[in-house]
């Protein structure tokens, strides 16, 4: 196990888990409109399921309004259906080839359920980070057993992997707290 390469690879994989977590929580709705809210929406189009952003353009014309411009007029109904069925609590209004989506005020119950979803995303990210840590530790044990590295070097590297894991998990916790505040802000 070459120390620099594998630690860099572990760090890259942990950073990937953070990036995925950031993407997940960006799609959670707060009091402000954001095109990311519609990221989880998929549409039945051309014989398969496609992400909404592959059949339409999403903009934020007003703080509490989303606008979806469907590229193919024949897809407007499918886009509306996909948004309604997405369990986001949104009711699009068809306006020609566009859909206007007013964002209702978030009530306390909905805010709490969004916080719960954010916690689930955080836990998923932490599990991914722990898997990366386990892979790193297993690699160190194997290298130590094969005689590629000494016991002291193995212990030193495993401490660095653990430190990297702890820092990455604390980054996830910090991002989660920030998102919680953003969601609960009235």
UniProtKB/Swiss-Prot annotation:
Gene Ontology MF terms: ribosomal large subunit binding
Top-level lineage group: Bacteria
Protein name: Ribosome-recycling factor
Presence of the UniProt keyword Transferase in the record: no
Gene3D superfamilies per the UniProt record, alphabetical: 3.30.1360.40, Ribosome-recycling factor (1.10.132.20)
Biological process terms in GO annotation: cytoplasmic translational termination
Family: Belongs to the RRF family.
Disulfide-bonded cysteines: none
This protein's encoding gene: frr
Renumbered residue ranges of the record's region Disordered: 140-163
Record-linked SUPFAM superfamilies: Ribosome recycling factor, RRF (SSF55194)
Functional note: Responsible for the release of ribosomes from messenger RNA at the termination of protein biosynthesis. May increase the efficiency of translation by recycling ribosomes from one round of translation to another.
Compartments where located: Cytoplasm
Principal subcellular localization: cytoplasm
Keywords, sorted A to Z: Cytoplasm, Protein biosynthesis
GO (cellular component) term, any one: cytosol
InterPro entries cross-referenced by the UniProt entry: Ribosome_recyc_fac, Ribosome_recyc_fac_dom, RRF_sf
CDD domains the record matches: RRF
């Amino acid at each position: 196990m070459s120390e620099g390469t594998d630690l860099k690879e572990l760090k890259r994989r942990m950073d990937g888990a953070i990036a995925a977590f950031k993407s997940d929580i960006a799609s959670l709705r707060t009091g402000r409109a954001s095109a990311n809210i519609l990221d989880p929406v998929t549409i039945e189009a051309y014989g398969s399921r496609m992400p909404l952003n592959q059949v339409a353009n999403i903009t934020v014309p007003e703080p509490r309004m989303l606008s979806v411009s469907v590229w193919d007029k024949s897809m407007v109904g499918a886009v509306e259906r996909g948004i309604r069925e997405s369990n986001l609590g949104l009711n699009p209004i068809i306006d020609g080839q566009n859909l206007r989506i007013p964002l209702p005020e978030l009530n306390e119950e909905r805010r709490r359920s969004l916080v719960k979803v954010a916690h689930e995303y955080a836990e998923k990210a932490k599990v991914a980070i722990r898997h990366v840590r386990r892979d790193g530790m297993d690699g160190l044990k194997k290298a130590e057993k094969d005689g590629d590295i000494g016991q002291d070097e193995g212990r030193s590297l495993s401490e660095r992997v653990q430190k990297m894991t702890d820092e990455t998990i604390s980054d996830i916790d910090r991002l989660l707290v920030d998102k919680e505040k953003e969601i609960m802000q009235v």
